[in-house]
A protein has these predicted regions:
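Amphipathic, small/basic residue-rich leader segments at the start of a protein or domain
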Residues: 1-96, 113-128
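Short, solvent-exposed polar/charged micro-motifs at secondary-structure junctions
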Residues: 41-44, 71, 103-104, 140-143
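Short hydrophobic "helix-edge" motifs at membrane interfaces and signal-peptide entry regions
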Residues: 53, 101-102, 151-152
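Glycine-rich, Trp-frequent "lid" loop and neighboring beta-strands that shape
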Residues: 69, 109, 113-164
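Active-site phosphate/pyrophosphate- and oxyanion-stabilizing loops and adjacent acidic/basic residues
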Residues: 77, 104, 148
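N-terminal glycine-rich flavin-associated loop
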Residues: 91-113, 142
């Protein structure tokens, strides 16, 4: 028989995230007007500080040198499953799309200068990133179909394409 249980260290972090979501995040989320963007943003900002400073739950996917928890794929799956039970959960842990993927991209391929300019503020929760995928000529959400491209023209970059 196959044992599908998590190793103790992963189960510990999974349960910690569950407790945090159940005792802190969900009550806050349910107490606000979820259609009022200013309340939603203020709640996320406030809970991010609690997650990071009081619970040690911050950037579960990133290395410690960037303030993260250095969790591997299995632990990230467990954390994501628990955080996703409250719609703002991934935002509170600074592990939401597209920032999580963009943090990985910057971590592995950015220059040191780019990391300081773009990755550090993302990891500190001071900025957000975006991904302009949709185009009028291409239906769907498959980024491999993106037609827009950039090319260097002297000292400048030219973006050629259409976005909605």
């Amino acid at each position: 028989m196959i044992d599908f249980s998590f190793p103790p260290e992963i189960e510990d972090v999974r349960l910690k995230v569950r407790r945090f979501m159940d005792t802190v995040v969900r009550p806050e989320w349910e107490s606000i007007d979820q259609h009022d963007r200013s309340q939603v943003v203020a709640t996320i900002v406030r809970l991010r500080a609690v997650a990071r400073d009081e619970w040690g739950l911050w950037l579960p996917h990133m290395p410690a040198e960037w303030g993260g928890m250095e969790l591997g794929p299995t632990a990230m799956a467990a954390v994501s499953a628990e955080a996703g039970k409250v719609s703002i959960g991934p935002y509170v842990l600074n592990a939401q799309a597209p920032d999580e993927g963009n943090q990985h991209t910057l971590l592995h391929w950015a220059t040191p200068e780019q990391k300081e300019k773009y990755l550090r503020p993302l990891c500190e929760g001071k900025s957000r990133s975006c991904f302009a995928m949709t185009e009028p000529e291409v239906a769907g959400s498959d980024p491999t179909l993106i037609k827009t491209f950039a090319y260097q023209d002297g000292d400048e970059w030219v973006i050629n394409g259409h976005k909605w």
